[in-house]
């Protein structure tokens, strides 16, 4: 039964096996260009401002912000659709299996933060970066996992997707409560009203996407203006899309999954990678990794993440609180735990907010995030590759 229910998820990740390579190529090209004679063109293009709206109603954002706030809201919308279906009738419909990524995400946020704090004790300025290694870059971690294709069971891909979504929601909440300026109560109220309207559409069984899309677009605008990262609007919208078990492959949720998955896999994710992987390495050196900020981030991402996710998951399974994903081993779960240390763009984003008043630490953030994410990518990939052969 699970095999039949997971067909849409398998279908998407078969696409992802190809798109993971496209994403990796896009990231490498961006990194090369941003450290070449074309770097000014690259950064100037991303920093160009575009106005989208009607008359005075709209937003004027840089190309980079449109990609990170709008396109990634669509990405979060898609992966939340996937996870919602898995909670209703798939891999996560079993409570004990559903609890594992939730518990793992908590460990994956707390332990890296503790590692960073331990290394930066005594320095009130650098302690402000405690949340940097707590984030997971969902697009890159899934992209790396997808390179392994069918050698990784669908259940582990579901586990990583669910964990990364929870992780990123945690990061968004951390940003909202610890690093944001004043949150707008009026816009937060409008978000709540929008969400209630969406739930009402779901309650009355509205199966046309247009009403959801219109309200969702306004909710995205309200979310952006509220001071909370706008990608959360994609999660909220997806959570209200109707799906009933008896509808099988004909629900609005399933139709949307199939309709937008190739665009997410081959357009949105590569564009995101190209726009965010371009980090200038000028002035960075490996010796600077020994400084408290980069060392705390490096160890938080590469050590703290895998220890946090793996240890709490192991304890939860051994005490019967949670259940292992189907067809997975402890070694393969460990490999996925390492991949959660790919913090990359989310960690860089949190780092820029954490040290907005102390920009002298930004270079340290960059090298710490790049080193920690790279180590997590390489070790996670090869551990999973080895586990697939056993």
Curated annotation (Swiss-Prot):
GO terms for biological process: regulation of pH. The chain crosses the membrane at residues 13-33, 61-81, 99-119, 129-149, 158-178, 181-201, 209-229, 259-279, 297-317, 330-350, 367-387. Keywords: Antiport, Cell inner membrane, Cell membrane, Ion transport, Membrane, Sodium, Sodium transport, Transmembrane, Transmembrane helix, Transport. InterPro entries: Na/H_antiporter_dom_sf, NhaA. It is a multi-pass membrane protein. It is found in: Cell inner membrane. Pfam families: Na_H_antiport_1. GO terms for molecular function: sodium:proton antiporter activity. One of its GO terms (cellular component) is plasma membrane. It catalyses: Na(+)(in) + 2 H(+)(out) = Na(+)(out) + 2 H(+)(in). NCBIfam families: NhaA, PRK09560.1, PRK09561.1. Na(+)/H(+) antiporter that extrudes sodium in exchange for external protons. This is Na(+)/H(+) antiporter NhaA. It comes from Pelagibacter ubique (strain HTCC1062).
